[in-house]
Amino acid sequence: MFVDVELLHSGANESHYAGEHAHGGADQLSRGPLLSGMFGTFPVAQTFHDAVGAAHAQQMRNLHAHRQALITVGEKARHAATGFTDMDDGNAAELKAVVCSCAT
């Protein structure tokens, strides 16, 4: 089996980058306050404000969840790359030991 550990590391880096991008989006979104009365002072405007506020809060929660998921994927990719590298190094050492013992 061939495993491209460099590609795993690259994917992990991209996943972390995407996670931080989602975090940045949440930060930017949190800076846009929804001021009371911004859509007017009549009752329907307040209802609309409440709906937009709920959607705003949900979007920020979604972005934070996406960040966590992307960072977790990146960590798992790095862990897999390390595991494959360690296994390959260990197998190479064992093979070398067998070859050396057969040569003597």
UniProtKB/Swiss-Prot annotation:
One Pfam family it belongs to: DUF2563
Name assigned to this protein: Uncharacterized protein Rv2078
Annotated source species: Mycobacterium tuberculosis (strain ATCC 25618 / H37Rv)
Lineage: Bacteria, Bacillati, Actinomycetota, Actinomycetes, Mycobacteriales
